[in-house]
Amino acid sequence: MVTYGKRMKTEFENLLKDIKIDRVIVENQIGPLALRMKTLQGMIMQHFIEKGCDIIEEIAASNKLKDYLKKKKTKYCERKRLSIEVTKKILEEKNNLHHWIPHFIEHKKKDDLADSFLQGLWYIKHNNLVNAT
């Protein structure tokens, strides 16, 4: 875990050095099987605490598809597939996002990109930060 933490810190320092960040959302990791991810979650939050970020929030994983599932029960693999489909549809429908389509389509971890995108979109919309419809 120390190696992961050091690498993460280096990547954050390089990627974010010229960006002012005043808000960070981190998907809350739950359950005993997610112990490693829970540790990384803590490292991410600690990094931004040390950088003086004003708002750091943990948000539930279930949020990202709430606006699309309408309380329908789904299995893990169904949610992964749906998040990819929903993200692709949004990218195709929003002209200002078209340039992201090739990156998304070619990426080997589409499910992770989709989850992050939808989680961010949910947060922006439900915190009235901009009109994200």
Name every feature range the model reports, one short phrase each:
Residues 1-133:
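Phosphate- and other anionic-substrate recognition elements at nucleic-acid/protein interfaces
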